[in-house]
Amino acid sequence: MGVRVAQPAAKQFVVLQQVEVLYGVVSQVALLHDAELLVVFDQLWQQFALAAHLFKHVAQVAAGHLALLELFCQLTNVVLVAAPRARLDQLRQLVLQAPVLLAAKRCEREHWLDQRRHL
């Protein structure tokens, strides 16, 4: 039974790490793309980061209590769901577009640098 409890906690922790990486990418793209969206994303992230911080402590305490761990996972998900649906859809689109937008910005910058070198 102990192993079954540890797996969701480990899996959730990996998800939190992935979200942190994703935040870095999306915030860069949002900054280039839509300043208002970045503000909304930052507010959402602060809520999620608080939940993530709490999760690390609660997961240790709840390791022996599957029901408590499951409840906390649900609460963590609620933090994300609580954001305005339209904004979440926009963020989802940004996440999907992130690699393309970042590549385009990189090309733009390289082109600008090339032009500067030729001056």
UniProtKB/Swiss-Prot annotation:
It comes from the Viruses. This is Uncharacterized 13.4 kDa protein in ubiquitin 3'region.
